[in-house]
Every structure is written in C-alpha cells, then in structure tokens.
C-alpha cells in the first residue's frame, strides 16, 4: 500500500514537472513569435520609409520581407493597430504636409514629387486623409 502511494506521488510529481516544463516552453515560443513579428514590423517600417514615394502595394513590401502579403497585413495590424496601407498613408500625408508647410513648391510639384498621376488625384487623396484640401492646409499653416 505504501509502495503504491509512493509511486503515485512520484508519478504526479513527474507529471506536474512535465506540465510546467510544457507551459514554460510555450511561453518561450510565444515570446519568440512576438519578437519575430516585432522584427518584421520594424523592418517593414524601415523599408516603407525608404520606398513609400514609389511603392504603395502590400505585395512589394511582403516580397522584400520574404513573407506573404496576408501575413504582413496581420503583423502590421497586430503590432501597431494600423494596416499596411494606413502606415503608407501616414508617410505620404506627413511628407505632403511638410512640403505644403515648409516649401514654396506648387501643389502640382508636390503631387509630382509624391508620385501622384495628377494634382487632382493628389488633392482628392489629401482631402480624404487630412480632412482638407492641400490649398486649405497650406493656408491654415501660414504664419500671420
């Protein structure tokens, strides 16, 4: 009877250790996955900051990162709460606002610099993303 009790305690102790080891291993795997996703996201931001003027497709960035567009989209959303396109739009709008505020370039020149097919396309894009036209933005930021 005592031998059975000892064997049972030994078995339960071994089982408990195995379960804790499994849980610890899963935590390590989860951390490694998070780290990989963070690395992918950081690399995406780096590549996007260098290419947003000419490359606006998720496929381009996914190919550069050697991952699928679907996975890149999931990583961006999970890591930052924003989609790949929202990030690209942020880069473009930030550049547009900077140029409108700090340069004397015409809206046509800015549209060309930002790789829009026409000033009209740029104007529609800017209004959709900034809430006002490029001209209105430029006028609102001028020092009186």
What residue ranges belong to the model's regions?
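Amphipathic alpha-helical segments enriched in hydrophobic/aromatic residues interleaved with Lys/Arg
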Residues: 1-9, 14, 46
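Core residues of bacterial helix-turn-helix
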Residues: 65, 114-115, 126
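Residues within helix-turn-helix
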Residues: 59, 70, 106-109, 119-120, ...
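Short, Lys/Arg-enriched, Trp-marked, Pro/Gly-tolerant hinge/linker segments that flank
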Residues: 2, 17-42, 50, 54-60, ...
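Short helix-to-turn junction characteristic of helix-turn-helix DNA-binding domains
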Residues: 48-52, 100-103
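Short hydrophobic/aromatic patch on the recognition helix
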Residues: 72-73, 121-122, 126
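Terminal helix-turn-helix DNA-binding modules in bacterial transcription factors
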Residues: 78-119, 139-144
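…primarily DNA-binding HTH/wHTH and HhH modules…
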Residues: 124-144
């Amino acid at each position: 009877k005592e031998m059975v009790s000892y064997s049972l305690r030994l078995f339960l102790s071994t089982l408990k250790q195995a379960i804790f080891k499994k849980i610890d291993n899963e935590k390590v795997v989860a951390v490694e996955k998070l780290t990989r996703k963070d690395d992918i996201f950081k690399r995406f931001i780096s590549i996007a900051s260098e290419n947003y003027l000419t490359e606006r497709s998720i496929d381009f960035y996914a190919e550069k990162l050697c991952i699928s567009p679907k996975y890149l989209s999931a990583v961006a959303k999970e890591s930052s709460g924003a989609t790949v396109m929202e990030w690209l739009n942020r880069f473009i709008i930030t550049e547009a606002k900077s140029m409108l505020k700090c340069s004397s370039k015409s809206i046509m020149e800015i549209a060309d610099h930002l790789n829009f097919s026409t000033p009209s396309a740029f104007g529609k894009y800017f209004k959709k993303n900034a809430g006002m036209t490029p001209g209105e933005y430029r006028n609102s930021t001028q020092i009186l």
